[in-house]
């Protein structure tokens, strides 16, 4: 993994200026991967001098001294230009998150922070179930106001599809019907995609068709969804 130099700060400055001049509600988030980075493209930036090792790879990269201190250095450099600071981590570690937050807030007390509750972590390898449950609340107390799971949808959709395929293979339509019953039950909690035609806006386009007089081709009025899902 390579580290982006802090000399890239003019890019943040330009983005901040453009957003402010245009009056656009833009959120600029600065991310650093310096916690795990092992290489950096050059050694000419004075802000990198404490972390560049004077040893180069065959491709010309400099070796980089990674870790939380490098993340803090970059975070402090990014803070004047970024709405959110995000340091990417290798494990879910509250102590590490606190060290970063404390160092940033000592200089920029109102700086908002971001944290990736990554699906690349084996969560139960590092935290108990109770610790997993309180992890994000503890992050919030430290100033991590934007917390997210990258690729949560990818993992949930693939697991759900795999489990449905297993049930369908073993039990045919009974396997699908069981999932459908869970959909019906979930409607009480706000789930809406039982009626997939409605969910994708078919009713809206039916209204458009009716408004222009093309009523013979509307989809919802005679559909099985309209007849069977109420």
Residue map of PLM features:
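Surface-exposed amphipathic alpha-helices with a cationic face
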Residues: 12-21, 98-109
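Active-site-proximal loop/turn and secondary-structure-junction residues that shape catalytic pockets
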Residues: 32-36, 90-93, 117-121, 153-155
């Amino acid at each position: 993994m390579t580290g982006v130099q802090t000399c890239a700060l003019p890019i943040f400055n330009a983005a901040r200026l453009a957003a402010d001049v245009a009056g656009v509600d833009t959120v600029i988030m600065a991310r650093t991967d310096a916690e795990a980075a092992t290489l950096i493209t050059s050694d000419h930036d004075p802000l990198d001098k404490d972390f560049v090792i004077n040893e180069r790879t065959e491709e010309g990269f400099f070796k980089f001294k990674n870790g939380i201190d490098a993340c803090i250095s970059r975070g402090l450099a990014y803070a004047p230009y970024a709405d959110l600071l995000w340091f990417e981590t290798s494990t879910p570690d509250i102590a590490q998150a606190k060290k970063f937050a404390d160092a940033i807030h000592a200089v920029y007390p109102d700086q908002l922070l971001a944290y990736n509750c990554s699906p690349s972590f084996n969560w139960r390898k590092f935290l108990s179930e109770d610790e997993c449950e309180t992890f994000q609340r503890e992050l919030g107390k430290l100033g991590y106001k934007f917390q997210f799971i990258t690729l949560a949808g990818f993992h949930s959709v693939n697991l759900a599809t795999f489990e449905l395929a297993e049930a369908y293979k073993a039990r045919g339509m009974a396997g699908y019907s069981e999932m459908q019953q869970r959909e019906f039950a979930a409607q009480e909690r706000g789930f809406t995609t039982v009626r997939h035609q409605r969910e994708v806006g078919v009713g809206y386009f039916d209204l458009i068709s009716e408004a222009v007089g093309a009523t013979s081709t509307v989809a919802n009025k005679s559909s099985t969804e309209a007849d069977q899902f109420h």
